[in-house]
Amino acid sequence: MKRHPWYIDYYEPIDDNLLNLSNNICYDEILINKINVDASLCNLFQYPDAAKTYNVLSNYCNIDVKNLAIGYGAGDIIHRLMIYFKNLSIGILTPTYELAQTFALNLGLTTFNSHNFDDIKTDVLYLANPNGVTGKAITKDQVLSLLPKYKYIIVDEAYADFSYIDCSVAKESLNVDNLIVVKSLSKSVASPGLRFGWCVSNKKIIEELQDIRSSTVVTSITHHVLEQLLNECPAHIDRMIQTKNYIENKYSCIPSNGNFVLFKKDPKLKCKIKKTVEGHFRMSLTDIETFRKIENDSATA
């Protein structure tokens, strides 16, 4: 499976009349105003201090640095995990994050895709929970019940902060032999451009995963703003959930455990929303005041 050519622009031009689910175009102005990026303090002329970045993340997660691995976004972490498991077979619960499948296939892993857990009888399971396509999630207990069936389970929790269901198994991964949890700021604080992701697991897996890390895993800019962003995460997530509750209560939607809503039919907003291949109209969340500005007063769907 080939990736998108690196020399062709992947993203469509920004259109103020079209909501693009790949970008945070309706960005939360509250968050923008609170994050102060002073280039003079970023020290671009030296390599970033990864140890300090790890300490900031460790304090936020309340997890020992020896149980954490940082990468350039969740995608980098998942790629390294696929390298780590290159001699094993991997099952991927679909539909899901496309690059997980691409990485596995391009690295030569024996790959099996299925919509059903019962069909996946591989060494490794990759599970996005909540699912970034359908918005569905399974509970923490359901995830843990799968552990005896696989040598390893990778749980991608990029959307977990927005879930109605208690689904995160990050803390549980510290004390079991075969569980790795992937996290990201791309969704939790709407900052995909920073490319900051991490995973949590037992110390043995983390130590081995660190052996295949890049020479650096964080930029000076990310290091400079990380603590501010992490501190803003809870309030930002609360604002996004408030918007989701407002939309799902007013419009006909499929309940979503992610940072997006799935309208069953076109909600007739002032900005157009693309239709997904599943036939829904998907919109990434923004703050409620921004949403009301693009909402037609009489529109319900």
Predicted features along the sequence, with ranges:
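N-terminal "arm"/small-domain region of PLP-dependent enzymes with the aminotransferase-like
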Residues: 1-49, 59
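Short, solvent-exposed loop/turn segments at secondary-structure junctions
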Residues: 24-28, 97-98, 130-133, 160, ...
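Conserved core of the PLP fold type I
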Residues: 41-148, 159-176, 180
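Structural motif
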Residues: 124-128, 154, 198-200
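PLP-dependent aminotransferase class I/II
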Residues: 178-254
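Conserved PLP-binding active-site segment of the aspartate aminotransferase-like
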Residues: 201, 262-301
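Conserved glycine-rich beta-strand-loop-beta hairpin in the small C-terminal domain of fold type I
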Residues: 240-248, 253-265, 276-281
